[in-house]
Amino acid sequence: MDKKGKIERTVIILMVIALWMLAALNSYIPEKAEPADEHEGILRFHVIANSDSARDQELKLGVRDYVLPKIEKEITSRMTGADADCDIAEEYAEHNLERIKKWALRYVRDKGFDYDVTTEVGVKAIPAKQYDDLYFPAGNYKALTITIGEGKGQNWWCVVFPPL
C-alpha cells in the first residue's frame, strides 16, 4: 500500500472512531425537557424583596414560605376533580388580594420590619425556568405578585397552578 493509501485509511479509521465516540457521548447527554404547551392555564407566584440586602432577601423568602402554603391550600380546597383549572386559581387570587396582603404584612411585621406590602394579579414577563421535567419558556404569564417595601430587590418565582 502506498503512502497516500495509508493516509486515507488512517483518516477513515479516525472518522469512524470520532463518530462512534460522538454516538456514545450522545447517550449520556440528558434530553431537554418538553416545553410547556402555552402560557395560558398557568398562574405564577412572584415575590419581590424591598432591596438586595441580606436581611431583605431573607424576609422575601420568609414571606414566600409563610404565604405560599396558605394560597396552595385555599386553591386546592376549591378544586374538585375535573373542575381543576387555572381559572379557579386566578379567580381565587384576584378575589383574595387583600387577604393575601394581610398574610404577607403580618409576617413582615412579626419579623420587625415596617415595610408596606402590595399584592396584584397581572401579566408579567417571566424568565425561562426548569422545574424537574417541565420547562417554562420565557414569556408573559399571569402572576400573583407580592411586593415588599420599595420592591427594588431580587425577586423569586414559582408556579401556583398547575401544582407541580
Predicted features by range, described:
Residues 1-7:
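Short, Lys/Arg-rich N-terminal segment immediately upstream of the first membrane anchor
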Residues 85-128:
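Amphipathic, coiled-coil-like alpha-helical scaffolding segments used for oligomerization/assembly
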Residues 134-164:
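Soluble extracytoplasmic domains of inner/organellar membrane proteins
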